[in-house]
Amino acid sequence: ESTFGQTPPKFWIRSLEGERFNSKKVKSPYVISFFFVHCPPCIKEIPLLYKFMSTNHPNVPLLFIDPIKDDSKKDIQRFSEKLNVPSSYFYKDSFGSISKKFFKDKMSFPTIVGIRGNEYLFRFNGIDETILDEIKLLL
């Protein structure tokens, strides 16, 4: 799904730890990864993306957003512990309202989106070393 020429939606959301992220107030680029707890590629990629971002772009906000109604905050908390990624990076999109702004039709997981201000920097379905190299250049 191409984002070329589109303006990213504005939104705010709270992390599992209650920290509020407001896209209107963020001046730096930020990265969103849409996932759900029973998604095999997400389980593999979330620790990889977290480690990559912590190492290469520690000041760029990284949000792991779960839009699936059946995934409770407790499920996501356990998921974060299992993957050894701090829960402060995880967000529950309780009504799917944020995710719907990013996906026209059907959601696909994982989807990784990079945004700066009013422009998309990238949008990938899944990541590998080549894509991580590309993200490093784009942020």
Please name every model-derived segment.
Residues 80-111:
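Short, internal strand/loop/helix patches
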Residues 7, 28, 107-109:
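Short, small/polar residue-rich loop motifs at catalytic or cofactor-binding pockets
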Residues 21-43, 49:
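Short active-site neighborhood of thiol/selenol oxidoreductases, capturing the structured segment around
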Residues 31-32, 62, 112:
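Hydrophobic beta-strand anchors of alpha/beta hydrolase catalytic cores
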Residues 1-23:
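N-terminal "domain-start" segment that seeds a small globular fold
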Residues 43-83, 96-100:
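Structural microenvironment flanking redox-active thiols in thiol-disulfide oxidoreductases
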Residues 55, 109-139:
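Thiol-/selenol-based redox modules, centered on thioredoxin-like
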